[in-house]
Amino acid sequence: MIANGSVFKFGDNIDTDVIIPARYLNIADYKELATHCMEDIDDKFISKVKKGDIIVATKNFGCGSSREHAPIVIKESGVSCVIASTFARIFFRNSINIGLPILECEEAANNIDEGDNIEVDFSTGVIKNITKGKEYKAEPFPEFMQNIILNEGLINSIKANRG
């Protein structure tokens, strides 16, 4: 799987309450819920993001409350993947479980800027910054985790591999 898009850059400790504020968690429709993605840190995020765009952040992305809604709204907003120096463990697991591609790569996270166009190859872990002509290498996920992401999440992966 390869993702290509423009970067939205965030710093350290972007918590789940910033990704999707708790005041909206009563909204059951994920597309509608996604219209509030990142609004407390960038109130124009949802109007700027295009299908395929990529979030790049530094340390501890997705910290805070255990909230499956956080990776769901990122995915539903059109973001194709998230790259960070590190992820909070529960966000990491929730992202895989719902099929949101993520990669940890400190060098990429520290050197990619807002608006850069990047290409991410999840099978190899190669992250290419097309804008700057740079390349970074993340550790790709094992095949079984890549299959979960390709099947759009854990439940779909289990259904697809029954048999």
UniProtKB/Swiss-Prot annotation:
UniProt-recorded Gene Ontology molecular function terms: 3-isopropylmalate dehydratase activity
EC number: 4.2.1.33
InterPro entries from the UniProt entry: Aconitase/3IPM_dehydase_swvl, AconitaseA/IPMdHydase_ssu_swvl, IPMI_Swivel, LeuD, LeuD/DmdB_bac, LeuD_type2/HacB/DmdB
Source taxon at top rank: Bacteria
Gene3D superfamilies: Aconitase, domain 4 (3.20.19.10)
Keyword presence, Amino-acid biosynthesis: yes
Alphabetized UniProt keyword annotations: Amino-acid biosynthesis, Branched-chain amino acid biosynthesis, Leucine biosynthesis, Lyase
Transmembrane domains' residue ranges: none
Gene Ontology terms: biological process: L-leucine biosynthetic process
The reaction(s) this protein catalyses: (2R,3S)-3-isopropylmalate = (2S)-2-isopropylmalate
Pfam families assigned: Aconitase_C
Pathway(s): Amino-acid biosynthesis; L-leucine biosynthesis; L-leucine from 3-methyl-2-oxobutanoate: step 2/4
Family recorded in the similarity comment: Belongs to the LeuD family. LeuD type 2 subfamily.
Function: Catalyzes the isomerization between 2-isopropylmalate and 3-isopropylmalate, via the formation of 2-isopropylmaleate.
HAMAP family linked to this entry: LeuD_type2
SUBUNIT field: Heterodimer of LeuC and LeuD.
Protein's name in the database: 3-isopropylmalate dehydratase small subunit
